[in-house]
């Protein structure tokens, strides 16, 4: 594929044009009076959204240099979304402001590397100041406020706060589409995994189609069980205790399954068999989690344990196990709290070391099942377009609320960045191009609050000057046009979201400013194919 190359000012301006097109489409969504953007889909109905990263992902430009510029800014939105789950619009606006001011100075003769150094130092100081400003989330109401702002709906915010309150900060909050209208919160106590009973004959509650075992023994096996002679010695021991038996294994089949089913139907012995969740190493790890949660051991030949010689003390215990056709819930496992805590910290370390998003997500699920609970928010709406938009907003708001719990909250509405810069720049001692770089950051930090004001029909410059002279934490409530104590009135942002947005924007801005050449694929010139004739004298 032939390439085209642009140098110096031409290269940077091409990138900037692409960035501006993307940023201008994204920034109309910022603030309580931000607008929506409609995204055309090749198949199905269009999507309506005000989520920065969703809009950014859809933008594909024709000009090769502009396309690269847009892709670089997309990376800001994606990275911020990955780290904090929200703040993508703020990150895009900050990147645009930093690049615009930076390129102006480069064109005027400033050294790009000096500017980059100044930007990095200033951003580090502002990030430190944001951390100092951050207040810990102490109440359910504060979680509700930050989630409400992200979702633009106080009912959603309240529901998310309730979900996080129930499952704890390590718990999982998932969002699912529902066939019914409105919002619904479903809580799961204990550990739940997505595997149901192997045979419907295990059902004990015919109305609900559930197998419910009270105070059961739990056999956890990392292999298939098919020969009844392997299982029989253990079945006899469990029968003598009068307790039911839950079996979690790779599979239960053949005469072993038939024996369990026949005894259940006759009322001789109550049991339920479930396939182990996951595959390969992940299955092994999940079975290990279940064993620690229930105080049992995984029966596996890898550790020298055979099924036929298993004793009762190797089985797990729980207050109750509920098995449906699709999922199994273990309620109040009898595991040792110290061992569970050890397993939790081990999984946390694995999450920190993991490079793969997929692995991290799966580890996070395992952590939640061990340390917290699972809350499912079910979303329903009148149309598919509204349903997708609502679901997306709720997912963003859940990430936002979790980020608030993690690193605390700061004043919202772009005020935290502006006020952090006032204090941070008092301590900076830079000269030359580095001082110019720091000044670029100071000007860029006004961009989010100016955009919120603009989207609300106010004059950005006037709002910035007014907020500069207010006490820390006070600023514009763009929804009402009043200047208030933002934290007191619940207009807050998670510190993690604000910090990530600034750091990711500065990272890309530095790359923009130090770019001296851009190499892109040469656009192909495809002449339109000739239209075939109508057939002339041909016989059909």
UniProtKB/Swiss-Prot annotation:
Binding site for ATP: 29-32, 86-90, 413, 477-479, 493
One GO MF term: isomerase activity
One Gene Ontology cellular component: cytoplasm
Top-level taxon: Bacteria
Enzyme nomenclature, EC number: 5.6.1.7
A Gene Ontology BP annotation from the UniProt entry: protein refolding
Keyword field: ATP-binding, Chaperone, Cytoplasm, Isomerase, Nucleotide-binding
Enzyme class: isomerase
Catalytic activity, reaction form: ATP + H2O + a folded polypeptide = ADP + phosphate + an unfolded polypeptide
Keyword Isomerase appears in the UniProt entry: yes
Compartment list: Cytoplasm
Pfam families: Cpn60_TCP1
Family of the protein in this entry: Belongs to the chaperonin (HSP60) family.
Function: Together with its co-chaperonin GroES, plays an essential role in assisting protein folding. The GroEL-GroES system forms a nano-cage that allows encapsulation of the non-native substrate proteins and provides a physical environment optimized to promote and accelerate protein folding.
Subunit structure: Forms a cylinder of 14 subunits composed of two heptameric rings stacked back-to-back. Interacts with the co-chaperonin GroES.
Entry protein name: Chaperonin GroEL 4
């Amino acid at each position: 594929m032939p390439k085209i190359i642009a140098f110096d000012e031409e290269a940077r301006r091409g990138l900037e044009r692409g960035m501006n097109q993307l940023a201008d489409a994204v920034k109309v969504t910022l603030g309580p009076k931000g607008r929506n953007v409609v995204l055309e889909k090749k198949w199905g109905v269009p999507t309506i959204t005000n989520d920065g990263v969703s809009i950014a992902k859809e933008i594909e430009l024709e000009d090769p240099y502009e396309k690269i510029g847009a892709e670089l800014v997309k990376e800001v939105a994606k990275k911020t979304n990955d780290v904090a789950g929200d703040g993508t619009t703020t990150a895009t606006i900050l990147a645009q402001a930093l690049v615009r001011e930076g390129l102006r100075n480069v064109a005027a003769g400033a050294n790009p590397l000096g500017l980059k150094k100044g930007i990095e130092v200033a951003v580090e100081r502002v990030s430190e100041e944001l951390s100092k400003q951050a207040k810990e989330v102490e109440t359910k109401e504060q979680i509700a406020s930050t989630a409400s702002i992200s979702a633009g709906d106080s009912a959603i915010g309240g529901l998310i706060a309730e979900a996080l309150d129930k499952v704890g900060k390590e718990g999982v909050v998932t969002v699912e589409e529902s066939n019914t209208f409105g919002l619904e919160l479903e809580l799961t106590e204990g550990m739940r995994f997505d595997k149901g009973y192997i045979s419907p004959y295990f059902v004990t509650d015919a109305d609900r189609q559930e197998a419910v075992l009270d105070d059961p023994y739990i056999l956890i096996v990392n292999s298939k069980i098919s020969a009844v002679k392997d299982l029989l010695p253990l079945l006899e021991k469990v029968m003598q205790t009068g307790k039911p038996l839950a079996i979690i294994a790779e599979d239960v089949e053949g005469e072993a399954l038939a024996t369990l089913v026949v005894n259940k139907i006759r009322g001789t012995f109550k049991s339920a068999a479930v396939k182990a969740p996951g595959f390969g190493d992940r299955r092994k790890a999940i079975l290990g989690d279940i064993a620690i949660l229930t105080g049992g051991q995984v029966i596996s030949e890898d550790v020298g344990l055979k099924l036929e010689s298993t004793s009762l003390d190797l089985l797990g215990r729980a207050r109750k196990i509920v098995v449906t056709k699709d999922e199994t819930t273990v309620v109040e496992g009898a595991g040792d709290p110290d061992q569970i805590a050890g397993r939790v910290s081990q999984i946390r370390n694995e999450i920190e070391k993991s490079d793969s998003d997929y692995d991290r997500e799966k580890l996070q699920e395992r952590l939640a099942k061990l340390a917290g609970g699972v809350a499912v928010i079910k979303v329903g709406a009148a149309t598919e377009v509204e349903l997708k938009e609502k679901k997306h907003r709720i997912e963003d708001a859940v990430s936002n609320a979790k980020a608030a719990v993690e690193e605390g909250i700061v004043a919202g509405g772009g005020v935290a960045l502006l006020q952090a810069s006032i204090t941070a720049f008092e301590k900076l001692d830079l000269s030359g191009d580095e001082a110019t770089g720091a000044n670029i950051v100071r000007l860029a930090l006004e961009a989010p609050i100016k955009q919120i004001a603009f989207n609300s029909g106010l004059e950005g410059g006037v709002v910035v000057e007014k907020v500069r002279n207010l006490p820390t934490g006070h600023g514009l409530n763009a929804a009402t046009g009043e200047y208030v104590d933002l934290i007191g009135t619940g207009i807050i942002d998670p510190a993690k979201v604000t910090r990530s947005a600034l750091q990711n924007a500065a990272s890309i801005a530095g790359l923009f400013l130090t770019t001296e050449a851009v190499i892109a694929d040469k656009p192909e010139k495809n002449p339109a194919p000739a239209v075939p004739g109508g057939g002339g004298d041909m016989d059909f």
